[in-house]
């Protein structure tokens, strides 16, 4: 298949997937007044899609509005779907011996939840307003990878060889930053880590602008990283003690 034909084919598939995810939703996990249940914090009753219009209008070099809007629509579909799934799971009668659908909902729940949250982290670390890491982030990158160039090299290499995500995260067990590869939203997901930099390498993230040329997309991503939210995520993660005690 020619690259242009493949690009149009993938574009159509992305838009169709986003539309499918956005249909057949139910009102999410509760419609009454919020209640903390005596715990003190009031939980959200449903997921609400965040807006990333600040990334449009040429704010990102190498990312067209068409590409970004299609990507936003896909993310919004994940939000719709996770609300639907969590409502179905909550309302399931656990005395019902027919658990085939229940199992399917749980399998899909992790995929839709991770799909929603990882996209929020991905869009959140784009913007290019702050082009260099600073403070604790810079020090830890140099400590754990030797240099920013080496760190970026690991992010991009993982992005080349995995189908889903490349993400840097603070490992609570060791206190170090590691780069992890996710084959799917809910496959190869590490535990006891807090993501700080997230890179979407599914074809839907770049196919409109770059077709199958993932290398050019990876270069564009690096050029458009906003390091400020990455620093803020790390500082938040560091506020939680790490080490052997986390697995008590």
Predicted segments, located by residue:
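N-terminal targeting pre-sequences for secretion and organelle import
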Residues: 216-248
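Non-transmembrane amphipathic alpha-helical segments
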Residues: 78, 82-85, 89, 119
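N-terminal secretory signal peptides and thylakoid transit peptides that target proteins
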Residues: 1-17
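All-alpha RGS (Regulator of G-protein Signaling) helical domain and cognate RGS-like helical scaffolds
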Residues: 40-47, 52, 62, 71-73, ...
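C-terminal segment of N-terminal export signals and the immediately downstream linker at the start
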Residues: 24-58
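Hydrophobic h-region of N-terminal signal peptides that target proteins for export
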Residues: 18-23
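Alpha-helical scaffold segments that form or flank carboxylate-/histidine-based iron centers
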Residues: 60-77, 96-117, 140, 184-186, ...
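An amphipathic alpha-helical core segment
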Residues: 156-225
